[in-house]
Amino acid sequence: MAMSERRHALSLTPILSLMRIAVFCSSSPTIDTKFIDLAFELGAEIASQGSELVSGGGHISAMGAISRGARSKGGKTIGIIPQKLVDIEFADHDSDELIVVDSMRTRKAKIEDLADAFITLPGGLGTLEELFEIWVGRYLEFHKKPVIILDPYGIYEPLHALVEHLETHNFVKPGMRDLIYWATSPEDAVAKAFGR
């Protein structure tokens, strides 16, 4: 093949960029199994679409399920976890890459740095903290990465109403809710992460 033919062939080859999707979710061992199943399905969908999973690096509850789901489809998993949680045997040692950090703050910063998009599943205060930090970062234009809430069970409906209420009293600027994509299925959430 001549040099000009090789250049032409290369120009026709699509350049695919690797997508890393971070998921914020529960590590509570007492949540309903439907939330664990949802996490597993989301992990499987992320891997099925050729993306890598970035998570909090835990092996229990929804956090563990999301990684198992990704691995069930051959996906790469990257866990970011503070040493303190490794010490109490919370770490997902099956992760393809387990990054141990010194604090929760460092964990969140590393997840934000590695991820190209963020999906939040139903969760508790830690999950909400992660969501709010990414959401506010998007609002302040520290990043322009997609932020998605996957909530087929309506857990976050009161949050949506609260933000709307805060908006009516001018504590939150109009359009803040529009910075979040709301999804009701893993397929929809991952599609939104890709901007579809």
Regions found by a protein language model. Give the residues of each.
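Short loop-to-beta-strand entry elements in the cores of soluble alpha/beta enzymes
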Residues: K145-Y153
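Active-site/ligand-binding-proximal alpha/beta "capping" segment
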Residues: T106-E141, I148
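Acidic, Ala/Val/Gly-enriched low-complexity intrinsically disordered segments
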Residues: A2-E5, A9
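A cross-family phosphate/adenosyl-ligand binding-site feature
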Residues: L10-L114, P152-R196
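Short, structured loop/turn "capping" segments at alpha-beta junctions
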Residues: T77, F142-K145
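Selective for proline/serine-rich intrinsically disordered segments
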Residues: A9-L12, T120, K144
